[in-house]
A protein has these predicted regions:
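Core dinuclear metal-dependent hydrolase active-site scaffold
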Residues: 1-25, 92-153
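Cap/insert and terminal regions of metallo-dependent hydrolase folds
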Residues: 134, 142-175
C-alpha cells in the first residue's frame, strides 16, 4: 500500500521472503522503508518475515504492526516474536474487526473476519480506502460457503479485489 502524496508505504503480511517483498517495493517506489505491516493471521506464510526486523538483521525501531487481538497476544507471548515487542523493534497496533482506522489522512483500513483455520489467531481480510478508491484484500480462506459474506456482492462494491489464490483445489500438495 503506497501513498504517493506522502511517500508512506505499508505491506500486508510479512512473508518468510520479506527480503523479496522489500526489493519489489523498492523497485516500484525507490525505497524499502516501510511505515507499517498489516498482518492477516498466524500462519507461517503471513508473519514469519517479522523476524527480519530484529537485532540480528534489520534492527528496526518501532515499526507499527497492525494485528487483531489474538494475533497480537500470539506475538507478545511467543518467541522470537516477543523479543521484537520487548526490544521495541515493532510496535503492536491492535485492531478490531469491522472498525476503520486511518493509516494517514489519505488511507483507511478496516479489517474483517474471514473463515480459516484459526489455531493461533483470527484471520482477517482488509478493506482499504485510498482517497476515493476502495479495495479488498482477502488472504487464505477455507471455503467461500463458510463465510456469511457473499463474495460476489462484496466484489461489486469495490474498485479492486485481491484474493489469495495459492491453491485451486484440495490435494494440490502431496502430503
Amino acid at each position: 500500500i503506497v501513498d504517493p502524496t506522502t511517500n508512506e508505504q505499508w505491506i500486508i503480511d510479512a512473508t518468510p521472503n520479506i527480503k523479496k517483498q522489500l526489493q519489489l517495493l523498492k523497485s516500484k517506489t525507490g525505497t524499502e522503508k516501510i511505515d507499517g505491516v498489516l498482518l492477516t493471521h498466524a500462519h507461517m506464510g503471513h508473519y514469519t518475515g517479522l523476524m527480519h526486523f530484529g537485532r540480528e538483521v534489520m534492527g528496526t525501531n518501532g515499526i507499527p504492526v497492525f494485528a487483531m487481538p489474538k494475533m497480537a497476544i500470539f506475538l507478545e507471548e511467543n518467541g522470537p516474536w516477543s523479543q521484537l515487542v520487548e526490544l521495541e523493534n515493532i510496535s503492536l497496533q491492535k485492531l478490531k474487526s469491522d472498525s476503520t482506522i486511518n493509516l494517514n489522512e489519505n488511507i483507511k483500513i478496516k479489517p474483517f473476519l474471514v473463515p480459516h483455520r484459526d489455531e493461533f489467531s483470527e484471520t482477517v481480510g482488509y478493506e482499504i480506502t485510498i482517497n476515493r478508491k476502495t479495495l479488498i484484500f482477502i488472504p487464505d480462506i477455507d471455503k467461500w460457503e463458510k463465510w456469511e459474506t457473499n463474495i460476489t456482492e462484496l466484489i461489486k462494491k469495490v474498485d479492486y479485489a485481491f484474493l489469495d489464490a495459492t491453491f485451486y483445489k484440495n490435494g494440490e500438495l502431496k502430503r
